[in-house]
């Protein structure tokens, strides 16, 4: 049996694993049992009724959380000319083309959280697939990070846009805020994510789609949430 820290052990005692909590109750409990002294990230795990082994049952996309994630994200934009200026004016942290590709290839530089590119840059950016792909940093049309509307893309990321992608076990993991957020803000962020996942339901998915939701802080225990109360 794995060993838990004393604080986590105490936190586990306060969470009833057999109960499906209302969203607000779940977040109140999460705040109460968060064991760390720092402002932990609140994470959600959503178990979906899909088989990710099939291409027609992939769930991937992005959504702007109404209250953001509490984290300032660093944005790199691959663009030239007017689009490069547009990116800078919108608040991108790094903007470039061949120079940025070379920096990543030669120096292994990865000092950004999100990469955005104009479609005409993807021939060049595609060379970085082996570096950016495994880290989830490759620009992708499905998440709105390959676009000519650079200003909007940058502003959305800065405003709290998150990307989601189902893993091999059929689970979506995503950050939805910080422990310091009010319960109301966490509930609204959770509902926004779940609504986006429902809209992204593959036509090939059969049976129950939302199979389970649990929330946790970075160092805290998982707390099960009543899915019907989230979508009500």
From Swiss-Prot:
<comment type="similarity">
    <text>Belongs to the universal ribosomal protein uL1 family.</text>
</comment>
<dbReference type="Pfam" id="PF00687">
    <property type="entry name" value="Ribosomal_L1"/>
</dbReference>
<dbReference type="InterPro" id="IPR023673">
    <property type="entry name" value="Ribosomal_uL1_CS"/>
</dbReference>
<dbReference type="InterPro" id="IPR028364">
    <property type="entry name" value="Ribosomal_uL1/biogenesis"/>
</dbReference>
<keyword id="KW-0689">Ribosomal protein</keyword>
<dbReference type="GO" id="GO:0000049">
    <property type="term" value="F:tRNA binding"/>
</dbReference>
<comment type="function">
    <text>Protein L1 is also a translational repressor protein, it controls the translation of the L11 operon by binding to its mRNA.</text>
</comment>
<protein>
    <recommendedName>
        <fullName>Large ribosomal subunit protein uL1</fullName>
    </recommendedName>
</protein>
<dbReference type="InterPro" id="IPR005878">
    <property type="entry name" value="Ribosom_uL1_bac-type"/>
</dbReference>
<keyword id="KW-0694">RNA-binding</keyword>
<dbReference type="GO" id="GO:0006417">
    <property type="term" value="P:regulation of translation"/>
</dbReference>
<keyword id="KW-0810">Translation regulation</keyword>
<dbReference type="InterPro" id="IPR016095">
    <property type="entry name" value="Ribosomal_uL1_3-a/b-sand"/>
</dbReference>
<dbReference type="GO" id="GO:0019843">
    <property type="term" value="F:rRNA binding"/>
</dbReference>
<dbReference type="InterPro" id="IPR023674">
    <property type="entry name" value="Ribosomal_uL1-like"/>
</dbReference>
<comment type="subunit">
    <text>Part of the 50S ribosomal subunit.</text>
</comment>
<dbReference type="GO" id="GO:0006412">
    <property type="term" value="P:translation"/>
</dbReference>
<keyword id="KW-0687">Ribonucleoprotein</keyword>
<dbReference type="GO" id="GO:0003735">
    <property type="term" value="F:structural constituent of ribosome"/>
</dbReference>
<keyword id="KW-0820">tRNA-binding</keyword>
<keyword id="KW-0699">rRNA-binding</keyword>
<keyword id="KW-0678">Repressor</keyword>
<dbReference type="GO" id="GO:0015934">
    <property type="term" value="C:large ribosomal subunit"/>
</dbReference>
<dbReference type="InterPro" id="IPR002143">
    <property type="entry name" value="Ribosomal_uL1"/>
</dbReference>
<comment type="function">
    <text>Binds directly to 23S rRNA. The L1 stalk is quite mobile in the ribosome, and is involved in E site tRNA release.</text>
</comment>
């Amino acid at each position: 049996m794995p060993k838990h820290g004393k604080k986590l052990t105490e936190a586990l005692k306060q969470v009833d694993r057999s109960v499906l909590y209302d969203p607000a109750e779940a977040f109140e409990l999460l705040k109460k049992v968060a064991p760390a002294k720092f402002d932990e990230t609140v994470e959600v795990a959503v178990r979906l009724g899909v088989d990710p082994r099939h291409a027609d049952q992939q769930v991937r996309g992005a959504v702007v959380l109404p209250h953001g994630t509490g984290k300032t994200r660093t944005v790199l934009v691959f663009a030239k000319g007017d689009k490069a200026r547009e990116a800078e004016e919108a608040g991108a942290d790094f903007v470039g083309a061949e120079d940025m590709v070379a920096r990543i290839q030669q120096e292994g530089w990865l000092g950004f959280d999100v990469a955005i590119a104009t479609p005409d840059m993807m021939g060049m950016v595609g060379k970085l697939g082996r570096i950016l792909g495994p880290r989830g940093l490759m620009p992708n049309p499905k998440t709105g990070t390959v676009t000519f509307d650079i200003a909007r893309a940058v502003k959305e990321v800065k405003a709290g846009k998150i990307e989601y992608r189902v893993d091999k076990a059929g689970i979506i993991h995503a950050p939805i805020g910080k422990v310091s957020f009010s319960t109301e803000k966490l509930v609204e962020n959770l509902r926004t994510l779940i609504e986006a996942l429902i809209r992204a339901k593959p036509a090939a998915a059969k049976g129950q789609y939302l199979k389970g939701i649990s929330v946790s802080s970075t160092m805290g225990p998982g707390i099960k949430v009543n899915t019907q109360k989230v979508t009500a």
